[in-house]
Curated annotation (Swiss-Prot):
SUPFAM superfamilies: Peptidyl-tRNA hydrolase-like (SSF53178)
Protein name, per record: Peptidyl-tRNA hydrolase
Gene Ontology, cellular component aspect: cytoplasm
Gene source species: Afipia carboxidovorans (strain ATCC 49405 / DSM 1227 / KCTC 32145 / OM5)
Function noted in UniProt: Hydrolyzes ribosome-free peptidyl-tRNAs (with 1 or more amino acids incorporated), which drop off the ribosome during protein synthesis, or as a result of ribosome stalling. Catalyzes the release of premature peptidyl moieties from peptidyl-tRNA molecules trapped in stalled 50S ribosomal subunits, and thus maintains levels of free tRNAs and 50S ribosomes.
Family named by the database record: Belongs to the PTH family.
Top-level taxon in the UniProt lineage: Bacteria
GO molecular function term, any single one: tRNA binding
Active site: 19 (proton acceptor)
Length: 201
């Protein structure tokens, strides 16, 4: 069994924010793979289904980003899951738009959602880092991630969410490198430049 966590802030006010791309991805996984309707649970919303023959629970914490770890800890404890069985989808300003990287453990790069999860669960969970770009000035990062994606960005956002959802079963079986490569090739084929030469790891 796996717990897939999408990070974001609850409510229509934040729906289109860059910070909410994690929510967008798990919504697309649920839609594409015919998961159960979303229901309130574990200080958030959950949807359940099967990917690659394995049971997967999707979780969208409703605690707001800074307290995401409370919901993740509650769900992981209920299902008796360790850190390695948790996959977190989150926005990553240190990656250019439309890029994606998978990482296990490591630093949190100032991401408050990851900080909260690491504090409540431990640090060795897997992260699917979804590039939203850096505004160029540290002082306006907060504004950048809490702004909606620009109209011109929406095509790659939709393509990235669809592509990640399409290949998500590779994450279930721990084939992170294969997953990353498949997403990279698919995004390239769709016309979005995702060459492996940008962003900090």
């Amino acid at each position: 069994m796996r717990l897939f966590v999408g990070l974001g802030n609850p409510g229509s006010k934040y729906e289109g924010n860059r910070h909410n791309i994690g929510f967008m991805v798990v919504d697309e996984i649920a839609r594409r793979h015919g998961f159960s309707p979303w229901r309130r649970r574990f200080q958030g919303e959950t949807s359940e289904g099967v990917l690659g023959g394995e049971r997967v629970v999707l979780l969208k914490p409703a605690t707001y980003m800074n307290e995401s770890g409370r919901a993740v800890q509650e769900a992981a404890k209920f299902f008796k899951l360790g850190e390695s069985e948790v996959v977190v989808f989150h926005d990553e300003i240190e990656l250019p738009p439309a890029k994606m990287r998978v990482k296990v453990g490591g630093g949190i790069a100032g991401h408050n959602g990851l900080r909260s999860i690491s504090a409540h669960l431990g640090n060795e969970y897997r992260r699917v880092r979804l590039g939203v770009g850096h505004p160029g000035v540290k002082e306006i990062v907060h504004i950048h991630v809490l702004n909606d994606f620009a109209k011109s960005e929406r095509p790659w956002v939709a393509a990235l969410c669809e592509t990640v959802a399409e290949h998500a079963e590779l994450l279930v079986s721990g084939k992170d490198s294969q997953f990353q490569n498949r997403v990279h090739l698919a995004m390239d084929a769709k016309g979005f430049a995702t060459e492996n030469n940008g962003g900090k790891d």
